[in-house]
Amino acid sequence: ISLLTDFCIGFHSTQGWELMIGSVYKDFGFTPNDQILSCLVSIFPVILDTIFKYSIFRYLNRVSPSLVVIYHSMKE
């Protein structure tokens, strides 16, 4: 699941994130600003990835609580 998430919401392709955020930025009619764009490119993928992985963990925890026990035993 983590590998699939990294392929979809990866931090690796900054050019792809610049293109997506830049096009949304222009669609809302904002003036292009490289500093704001680079800040959004560095923050937005991390937040999106964290929210997505947290929601997957919460879903799997509801489906099978024994996964939490397995996870804690793997950490030890």
Swiss-Prot record:
<dbReference type="GO" id="GO:0009706">
    <property type="term" value="C:chloroplast inner membrane"/>
</dbReference>
<comment type="similarity">
    <text>Belongs to the CemA family.</text>
</comment>
<keyword id="KW-1001">Plastid inner membrane</keyword>
<feature type="transmembrane region" description="Helical">
    <location>
        <begin position="35"/>
        <end position="52"/>
    </location>
</feature>
<protein>
    <recommendedName>
        <fullName>Potassium/proton antiporter CemA</fullName>
    </recommendedName>
</protein>
<keyword id="KW-0633">Potassium transport</keyword>
<dbReference type="GO" id="GO:0015297">
    <property type="term" value="F:antiporter activity"/>
</dbReference>
<dbReference type="GO" id="GO:0006813">
    <property type="term" value="P:potassium ion transport"/>
</dbReference>
<keyword id="KW-0812">Transmembrane</keyword>
<comment type="function">
    <text>Contributes to K(+)/H(+) antiport activity by supporting proton efflux to control proton extrusion and homeostasis in chloroplasts in a light-dependent manner to modulate photosynthesis. Prevents excessive induction of non-photochemical quenching (NPQ) under continuous-light conditions. Indirectly promotes efficient inorganic carbon uptake into chloroplasts.</text>
</comment>
<dbReference type="GO" id="GO:1902600">
    <property type="term" value="P:proton transmembrane transport"/>
</dbReference>
<keyword id="KW-1133">Transmembrane helix</keyword>
<keyword id="KW-0630">Potassium</keyword>
<dbReference type="Pfam" id="PF03040">
    <property type="entry name" value="CemA"/>
</dbReference>
<keyword id="KW-0934">Plastid</keyword>
<keyword id="KW-0050">Antiport</keyword>
<keyword id="KW-0406">Ion transport</keyword>
<keyword id="KW-0472">Membrane</keyword>
<keyword id="KW-0375">Hydrogen ion transport</keyword>
<dbReference type="InterPro" id="IPR004282">
    <property type="entry name" value="CemA"/>
</dbReference>
<keyword id="KW-0813">Transport</keyword>
<keyword id="KW-0150">Chloroplast</keyword>
